[in-house]
C-alpha cells in the first residue's frame, strides 16, 4: 500500500 503524501 502506497499513499500519495
From Swiss-Prot:
Disulphide-bonded residues: none
Location within or outside the cell: Secreted
UniProt keyword annotations, A-Z: Amidation, Amphibian defense peptide, Secreted
Domain of life: Eukaryota
Gene Ontology annotations for the cellular component aspect, listed alphabetically: extracellular region
GO BP annotations, alphabetical order: defense response
Tissue: Expressed by the skin glands.
Residues that bear Methionine amide: 5
Protein name in UniProt: Electrin-3
UniProt source species: Litoria rubella
Amino acid at each position: 500500500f502506497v499513499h500519495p503524501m
